[in-house]
Design a protein with these regions (language model features):
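Membrane-topology segments of multi-pass transport proteins
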Residues: 1-46, 69-327, 564
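Residue-level signal for pocket-adjacent positions within structured domains
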Residues: 64-65, 79, 316-317, 487-492
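Alpha-helical transmembrane segments of integral membrane proteins
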Residues: 48-58, 324-564
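Aromatic-acidic/polar surface patches that form glycan- and anion
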Residues: 30-33, 48-51, 536, 540
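Short, strongly hydrophobic transmembrane alpha-helices
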Residues: 49-70, 358, 538
């Protein structure tokens, strides 16, 4: 005690002013202060996996936004004539790489091989790629790369109006593109109905009554055309008038006919034999019916004519970068539109769930007590309702309401509205639970008590002091909600529970379902139908997983300074 008094009663004269050099000062920071978000960004950039995931997500998002503007096709488009045509890129179409060139490996018998050769001979197109053919050891099967675009050939005979018949001739004369090809006389065609109107059969066949007709070859092994030839000076009334470009070899076919005089009598020589003369005959390009003209049109050129002259929809040729489905839908366009819908839908649902969940969870966790108990019981009751039941009830009852009220503009988005309500009904509960947990964790910390002591309002404490510390966990949950929503929506549309294939609306799951249908045929040439949507989904899920983990670590305040 005496010692303490001794120190307390120090005489003033014993004090001396210190030198300025003895004073201790905090060193001035040489660097600028780093904010919370700047530090989070630095930590995120040091996570290579998260950066790669973010880049992949950015590429997928840009694909969903930009790709629809670079294709004339839409999900509404479909053309059964070009079903299951393989992916084709202009970069590889004319190369010898045998990759992404619109071809597939075809295995067929000798008759099928002859039919493809016949199409090549008539149209001049390379249907058998590079003329490379492999024959099995027993000689029964032929293997070759088959062009799925040109191999469509002519399909069935078409009946068109005389006006359209004349317009096609006008188009041919202007462009020099051959759309119309010579027809075969009805009496010269195969007998069976399916073969009689098969426009690909333009040649002489061995047996007209056979189920599978076989081309008849000449002595040199060539296809024998069976076109309808007529005398232009005495054309039958059933031959439609034709005044346009003709195929090669139709410059007046020399035919030996019976010579007749001016009165129509047969001319005979001195020995009484019928005199023959050579006349120039031409091929018939249309069969005239009372109100229509029956024609043979090459599908590839007729497709171009339809879209450039009639529909004028911006489509210039049948060209599908990712191929087509069994119904003739363009996979590239459907995937782009489906991805765009998935991103927009998942983002909207995630944002709404995030806002509602944050508000609900923060109130529940901060105030606690009976209010927290009541709010938690409500969440448990609501969360116990299966999402599938909500979807089913909304699908039937809400769909009926839309149709009965004649809101036709909403019919196309009926399924999207049902999905939104279903995912929102219980989707925010998980975020609310995580937010509540974070508020319980931090609300009794010293800095929170200090802020309350200094008079900070509840809202300031909640969103200024507590919320930023729990942001890492919450943001991670948001980053994983988006792919989860996309995956759920894809699964429901894949299973057919929700139909998003209406108008210009489509889904990645619908494409995967189309791929499954293609696989049921056990044809590996159709694997591309499922390949592209599945690849998109796999990249999306993996990249969001990496991205979410990176965000969690970046927004974790306990890691502040760890990047130094």
């Amino acid at each position: 005690m005496a010692n303490m008094n001794q120190y307390q009663n120090i005489p003033v004269e014993k004090f001396r002013f210190s030198q300025k050099t003895d004073l201790g000062h905090d060193k001035k920071f040489e660097t600028k202060p780093v904010s919370y978000f700047q530090g989070a960004f630095r930590r995120f950039c040091k996570n290579k996996g998260a950066v790669v995931g973010g880049v992949i997500i950015l590429v997928l998002v840009l694909f969903a936004i930009i790709a629809p503007f670079f294709t004339p096709f839409t999900p509404r488009y479909q053309d059964a004539r070009y079903s299951y045509v393989t992916p084709k890129s202009k970069l590889f179409a004319n190369s010898n790489l045998e990759f992404w060139d619109g071809c597939k490996i075809k295995d067929t018998n000798y008759v099928g091989y002859l039919k493809d050769l016949a199409l090549e001979a008539e149209t001049g197109r390379e249907i058998i790629k590079n003329d490379k053919v492999t024959i099995s050891e027993d000689g029964a099967t032929y293997y070759y790369r088959y062009d799925t675009y040109y191999g469509v050939g002519f399909g069935k005979y078409k009946e068109i109006t005389p006006e359209k018949y004349a317009d096609i001739q006008r188009y041919q004369n202007e462009t020099g593109r051959q759309v119309l090809y010579p027809v075969v006389k009805l009496s010269d065609r195969p007998t069976l109905e399916k073969n009689k109107y098969d426009a690909n059969i333009y040649y002489v066949v061995e047996d007209k009554k056979a189920v599978t007709v076989r081309p008849k070859l000449d002595d040199d092994g060539n296809i024998i055309p069976n076109y309808w030839k007529y005398d232009p000076d005495d054309a039958p009334g059933t031959v439609a008038k034709y005044d346009s470009i003709r195929i090669e070899g139709d410059e007046g076919v020399p035919v030996l006919v019976t010579k007749v005089d001016e009165n129509g009598n047969v001319v005979r020589d001195e020995k009484g034999k019928v005199v023959k003369e050579e006349k120039a005959y031409y091929y018939a390009y249309g069969i005239q019916f009372p109100s229509t003209v029956q024609v043979r049109v090459e599908t590839y050129e007729y497709y171009i004519y339809e879209h450039t002259q009639e529909l004028k929809d911006g489509i210039t040729e049948p060209f599908f970068l990712f191929g087509t489905t069994g119904t003739g839908k363009d996979i590239f366009a459907c995937l782009a539109y489906g991805a765009r819908f998935s991103f927009i839908f998942a983002s909207v649902v995630a944002i709404v769930n995030f806002i509602v969940g944050i508000i609900w969870g923060s109130i529940s966790g901060y105030f606690g007590g009976k209010l927290d108990l009541a709010m938690e019981r409500f969440c448990e009751i609501l969360g116990s309702v299966p999402t599938m039941i909500i979807i089913t009830l909304l699908k039937y009852h809400m769909g009926r309401f839309i149709l009965e009220n004649a809101l036709y503009e909403l019919v196309d988005i009926q399924s999207a509205i049902v999905l939104f309500i279903s995912f929102f009904a219980t989707g925010w509960i998980g975020i609310a639970g995580r937010t509540r947990m974070q508020f319980y964790r931090f609300k009794n910390q010293e800095y929170v008590l200090a802020a309350r002591t200094l008079g900070a309002s509840d809202s300031r404490i909640m969103f200024k002091h507590i919320f930023p510390n729990g942001l890492g966990t919450i943001v991670t949950s948001i980053a994983l909600i988006i792919p989860s929503m996309i995956y759920s929506e894809t699964s429901l549309s894949y299973l057919g529970i929700i139909n998003l294939e209406a108008g210009n609306l489509t889904s990645v799951g619908t494409l995967i379902n189309a791929g499954q249908e293609a696989f049921q045929t056990l044809d590996l040439n159709k694997a591309y139908v499922a390949l592209f949507p599945c690849l998109f989904l796999v990249l999306l899920m993996l990249s969001f997983n990496l991205f979410g983990n990176g965000l969690r670590d970046a927004f974790n305040p306990s890691l502040r300074g760890s990047e130094d």
